[in-house]
């Protein structure tokens, strides 16, 4: 029951598509015609949201201090555990390549050892969260704004669910409460940055 923050990036748009002989990560810019042919809204296919959010989370002092654990749950119901040691590729193209590898091989190992940096794990997410830990969803639709610092527990773990999709609100069945953290709609990446900053301030991580 020691203190740490668990973040679930919910509804992430991570799926592969076969183009010629290779697989690519489906995205709205590169595969617009293909998406329209399949009757899908390209505006919803936004893996860049997950990429930007992961950069914010994994680069944070909170993560460097060993107080953060990140999970990704995709629109296709794939659950991914992100090892805190993972260095997320800076460029979107390289991130896409990494995700294709992960989705097909179910894990990605470190270049310099046997350690798995990213791995697909069994649903549901609840099986992987600390027993009895508070689970909070974030949504712009909640009327009253909560000061993030008030959500930071003194000494126990807490889970915060952040929507990694373009439009809509987090709608999962395992959160105990929903909070809004700003009077303005925030991007997922900015939400992640604000959350980690609040936890760093309260827990004295500088």
Specify the residue positions occupied by each region the protein language model found:
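RNA substrate-binding interface of SAM-dependent RNA methyltransferases
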Residues: 1-144, 200-205
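Surface-exposed beta-strand edges and their flanking turn/coil or helix-capping segments
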Residues: 20-22, 85, 150-151, 175, ...
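Conserved binding-pocket/active-site segment within a compact domain
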Residues: 123-183
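Structured adenosyl-cofactor binding patch, chiefly the S-adenosyl-L-methionine
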Residues: 166-206
